Amino acid sequence: MLLNLNGIRVDCVIGERPDERTRLQTLRVDVRLEIPDRAAETDALADTVDYAALAERIRAALVAARCRMIERAAKVAADVCCAEDKVTSAVVTVTKRGAVPGLESASAVCETTRKNKENE
């Protein structure tokens, strides 16, 4: 079963330039989780990922991380996702609008599995 969480908004410090290190910018985080099918059968929250709680953990992790690169932000968010017991894999896209003049947005994608996480 795939579970998508689209458009998680995170206001955090992100960027390399000195002016970016002193202000909050908004990231969009999109998450695709592979989870067991059980919740589709039981219709019970206990059998799936509490995505409201997961979104808050992603926000907190990115605020604390103060990443310079969106690539790092994507990995931080993916690690949070794979720390969930019911998640077997995660694909996380982090998008930063206005990263450079003349560019609408830049995004980084991190794909990880619980197996990859356990081998670190």
Question: Locations of the language-model features?
Answer:
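N-terminal, polar/charged subdomain of small-to-medium soluble alpha/beta proteins
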Residues: M1-E120
